[in-house]
């Protein structure tokens, strides 16, 4: 990424981990965004088909429950009326057009971070735009990301439950098997995550094309029976319903939001498919299919108000219910898979940005580096999903918990989007506010409507999100305290080199690489090696690993070396926050710059800290213990940076935190 010379120098954001071995610098260049259109090696239509299978799974399965829940909320126990149906349809239509189409598809998809999207990418883009540390943007990014994790638990539960619930309509005797079958499907889904999804991912696009085609045909048949339902296109019905129904209108608005959940995924998956394929898939296929189905459900309920109980499945003849249940189950599994994969990617980005400790990462594909599996995250999601299914039992109960997490993320995206439009795109503040403020107002309206369901279940994603945000806060705060304590005993590297030149220790052959967070000071492992072994290698490398504010960095920017004496060199390796750090592979690039790197004659020295809790650390004891637990759960630096274990020497120290 080019550096703006007018800025004078690159400004660094340092986020330190529990030991020097996995300290990471966040480096940002103050420069304008270079818009990328995502992968260009595959054909446009192949990418469009792929986006239909991955990006739109969540929002594409919303017709299973969104219209049903919204009309039930509007009726509030009373008979369903034409005014209610048209009001709900109009609200759904304009919510999809304003929140998803205008805000995400037409606006935020242009706010890419070197081709990548998502809440944390937007946060990093905003930080870069401001050119300084912004705790406000960091807080927004953390809240948005935390709520996405909560959403990642609810989406599989409500989607699969809604699909399997169709069995009750086909065969009432199967009603008692809905929850057990849902649990079985979800357990199998999470169990196969470690094997990767490469074998079945190619079928996601075609299956979802069949799904969207089917729901569009189902809707078109019923619209043909009662074309008057198309009157709901007029926004008058939406406004009239809200103004005339008071609190019930606000409650209904919370249920209508179910129709746009998953809209944020369009932005999160930007890097996988590119802007134009996602826009084409949404505008010309997915959006029309969804609207036709929603209006078809409306036409059905207008002709038979009792159909609202199972409005989606009642759209087909009885003998087609079971095949539709099968197709719906496949679609919801695909939607769940996309959300689970998104959670892995989000946590991985958080780790790279220093917001979480290094969790174990397994790569499930030799050809696609982005296909990863995080065992701890998988277990956490499985436990959360199982608890939701067993506690709430039905999609209607879960609907109360759904929405609050997504609406929170959307509000955060809107505010961070304003910063990017204002500072990075160089729009006038008033113009940027005029563009983004209406979207934030709409998002806040949905957020307020979902808050009304706090006691009915909305507390669940808020609890998950608060726990996640608390974990990130603890990790950041504990890391900061650890840095302060380390600073007090650190020795400047230049002072040590001068001292060693005057009184050189015994020199041994080979190269020693010392991982550190700050190359200006002596790595702890180097100090202990001199203190206990009383030797110095022929070549000593002080290695710093940085994470950029961009998803990827060019190979030309990966490696930088500075020779500071005959025996000492400083090396900086730089990775994007979506790249897997591979230290030996990156160091091999150094050969092109004249450094003869040989892995077999190189030893990597890693310092590992043993932490103890202290009431005087600045954090409450419970936070001390949480930070220590997070530190212990972190993956080894050798594994994370893919360093051969046979070439690693670990040096331990004890620190009171």
UniProtKB/Swiss-Prot annotation:
GO biological process: potassium ion transport
TM helices/strands, residue ranges: 40-60, 88-108, 135-155, 172-192, 198-218, 241-261, 282-302, 320-340, 380-400, 402-422, 432-452, 454-474
Keywords: Cell inner membrane, Cell membrane, Ion transport, Membrane, Potassium, Potassium transport, Symport, Transmembrane, Transmembrane helix, Transport
Catalytic reactions on record: K(+)(in) + H(+)(in) = K(+)(out) + H(+)(out)
Gene Ontology cellular component terms for the protein in this record: membrane; plasma membrane
Membrane-topology annotation of the record: Multi-pass membrane protein
Classification via Pfam families: K_trans, K_trans_C
Subcellular location: Cell inner membrane
Functional note: Transport of potassium into the cell. Likely operates as a K(+):H(+) symporter.
Entry protein name: Probable potassium transport system protein Kup 1
Species this chain originates from: Bradyrhizobium diazoefficiens (strain JCM 10833 / BCRC 13528 / IAM 13628 / NBRC 14792 / USDA 110)
Upper classification of the organism: Bacteria, Pseudomonadati, Pseudomonadota, Alphaproteobacteria, Hyphomicrobiales
Gene from which the chain derives: kup1
